[in-house]
Amino acid sequence: SIRRQRQMCIRDSCNDDGIDILDIEIPEGYALSAGTSTIFLNSSVAYDTPADWITGAYDVRFTRGDRLYDDVRTSNNGHGGGLGPVYAGYSCGSCHRNAGRTKPSLWTEGGSGSYGFSSMLVYISRKNGAFFQDYGRVLHDQAIYGVQPEGKLSVEYTYETFSFPDGEAYTLCKPNYTISEWYAEEIKPEDLFCTVRIPLRHVGMGQMMALDPVEIEALAAKSNYPEYGISGRCNYITERGVRSLGLSGNKAQHADLTVELGFSSDMGVTNSRYPEEICEGQIQVNQGSMMGLSYDQLDVSTEEMENVDLYMQSLGVPARRNVNDPQVIKGEQNFYKAKCHLCHVTTLHTKTRGSVLLNNTQLPWLGGQTIHPYSDYLLHDMGSEIMGVGLNDNYISGLARGNEWRTTPLWGIGLQEKVNGPVSYTHLTLPTNREV
């Protein structure tokens, strides 16, 4: 496969088809972002390349999982099908391009539903936090041919320019979302809480799943710096009947990589954990049936989902680059001076046994590693707004309140534009560059 060729080229110090490969000696310390899972790429596939320990049968499974992650699902019954009848994305890669992020498509499409595609996830609820009976927790603004989407998402952006103390300008864009063309009950704006999020990068997923909960809980115990107005806490959720430490998601609202949930909620693809259509009981199931589709079988197998889980957990993490560059060193000094490290913790450790897949297959290669994700994976109160733009989305996730957000890991962020082009750096599309 092309990925294996890329890895071979790294080892042999060659170059294939102009792919940009860093020809450097393996450094020590912080440059090794993820221990033995660190990779040395500076290209558009820097997030989408396996760690070196993926070989043999695992390489075969990785490739299968990669294909399932990227391939466009169809509405047909059978292998590769099951999309819809309503959905939010047509594949994992449609929102997580190259295992990264996507530019909010509403910038150019003008709206979602029958009018365009949205790569953003729209959470909706009543003002009291309850879900709408006819819609659930997520607005599915896409639908297969002949089926009505749940609603249309539109947006208007307001731009405002500010300046740093040295005079350098930066821009914040404030989104104003509206939902129209509801398929059932029309929800009035005054009755609706709506939070729209851009997909997260899938960098370091395996390392995150291998983290030692004791270390994270210890960080929460000491993460209280009243002199800086900083404190952090864990999110705990109940999944599969077990109370667990939340690690993944904008609000650390999940204890795993949500592969099964992603297939179901995002794509409408039924599976062993979520065997019912996401719009079960809604008119869209009948509309799909009238198009000749059957909804009496699972759309994706557990084995296929396990391969996607393996793919995500075994992706390599890009090394820190240019660590001896004077400007980089100065930036690192400013990082500590500004106390960024109090939340974006530089160094963590993985459990000795590593992580496990959905079928409890052990991944020992992820165990006993010193990693540098630049995150504490804790919830922090981000306040109600920044420069007049609301940060409190009033959406409760586990123990996380509306103004609390998980510290985003920073590893690989310097390659984001190379991987995904000009995209936002927060869940709300606020800043248009990293400096903010």
Give residue ranges: language-model regions:
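Short glycine/threonine-rich turn/loop motifs
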Residues: 25-56, 60-238, 317-425
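Single conserved hydrophobic/aromatic residue that forms the stacking wall/gate
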Residues: 1-6, 10-12, 427-436
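Ser/Thr-centered flexible coil motifs
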Residues: 55, 256, 301-302
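Bacterial Sec-dependent N-terminal signal peptides
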Residues: 4-7, 11-34
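Extended, non-globular alpha-helical segments
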Residues: 18-19, 29-30, 109-111, 292-300
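Active-site substrate-binding loop specific to GH73 endo-beta-N-acetylglucosaminidase modules
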Residues: 231-291
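Extracellular low-complexity, Gly/Ser/Thr-rich intrinsically disordered linkers
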Residues: 277-317, 327-333, 406-428, 434
